[in-house]
Amino acid sequence: MKSIRLLCLLAVLILLNACGFHLQSKAELPPEMQRTRLEIQSPYSQFARRLETHLEQSGVNVVTALDGAAILEVPVNATRKEIQSIGDNARVREFRIRHTVQFRLLASDGTEMIPLQTFEQSRVYSFDEQDILAAEREDEFLRNDLADNLARMVVRRLGTYGK
């Protein structure tokens, strides 16, 4: 019985390895980013908090002073809600949430390391006017998920500098 379990476990591990699966590790960011100042529109947004967390998890010391620090500029950090579809009774059935982020990385001397980049993600969710509280919770969950995904994308992109 133990040998069957062991064989099954081994088969699963081989299949996962064969398909290219690997655990996500922290991004290796350029050494110039050891100290980084974050200049972001909406500094108290969910995206800003998630970006700072992911940067710190990757070994970046996020600072407020400019002396000797790289600058990560995020001039655009915008979320908008759009009507996706309308039902037969002329009422909204689905919404789309779009989150757009633009960023660029400057060295401590002001030279551009990564030019302005734009990332955008969106999610669609159904709206039920009979259950407005659930729709609000889903809206909030999707906004947080988009913010986290975009923050991860930005950090991964920063990790490609010089490669």
What do these predicted ranges mean?
Residues 55-59, 105-109, 153-162:
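Sec/Tat-exported extracytoplasmic proteins
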Residues 48, 52-55, 98, 116, ...:
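Extracytoplasmic/secreted envelope proteins and their assembly/folding machinery
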Residues 68, 73-118, 122-140:
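Surface-exposed short loop/turn segments
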Residues 32-78:
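N-terminal segment of the mature soluble domain
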Residues 20-23:
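Bacterial signal peptide processing site
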Residues 133-163:
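C-terminal/domain-edge helix-coil "capping" segments
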Residues 15-18:
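C-terminal motif of bacterial Sec signal peptides marking the signal peptidase cleavage site
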Residues 1-8:
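Bacterial N-terminal signal peptides that target proteins for export
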